[in-house]
Amino acid sequence: MKLKIYIDEAGRGPLAGPLYVGAVLPRQRFTKNHYKDSKILSERQREALFQKIQQTESKNQILYGYGTASSREIDLHGMTKALQFGVLRAVQMILQKVYQAEIIGQLGKSLCSCDAMQGIVLQNLFLEQENTLEAMAQIADIFRGLGLELELSIDGNRTFGVDQTLKCPVITIIHGDALIPEISMASIIAKVLRDHVMIELGKDYPQYNFAQHKGYGTQEHRDLIAQHGPSDIHRKLFLKEYFPEFKKKPKKPKQSKKVSRPPRKKKPLAEKLF
């Protein structure tokens, strides 16, 4: 049986704050897209649809999850790797919900066939605060052993290496957030949850007015960075586009030190021959 999970992200381009990835596992088919891409919705519309998504999950029609990557992780590893982390963490939340819910029917029977040792391993893996790539691969292997194959559909045209980590098909869909209802839901989940976080961060860092621009590179935000300097949640990797002082200076090649040697003594001709 396939577990088809639909994925989209929010917060790829901002100068500050985390990246968020939303994920949706439908338990019924959605033929009409009532959700739309989060980018073309107003904040009020997104909030209303997010509440509808929560209600849809409470009716057992979907399971949803999310994953994040911090600004520090973006600086350390780059955006592609951060997206991989976010996708894997979102998938982990979905699989944890699947495991805990023991969905009725074929999926439930598969989970019930999980032996005690596998169950303990899964619980320990789910409890880890920072799951490694190896741990996520192990979770996917256990589900695969139970006859539950993962299949991911991601908005855009890149897999971020998730297919290699989870050893599962990953379908990329350009403009998927406008075409596929479940990807639209994932887009709204990621956007709304990230906005909530940025509003809260605005209380901790009032000098940047995060509640207004959500960390994106507006002129106001850039002016505030120039005035106050960057905070610890700003992405130094992204700031260099606007602030030359964040560009890495090329390292000067090390010059080899010349070792002074004593002058060689000339040997007499007889010594050279023998």
Predicted regions: what they are:
Residues 1-274:
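RNase H-like, Mg2+-dependent phosphodiesterase core
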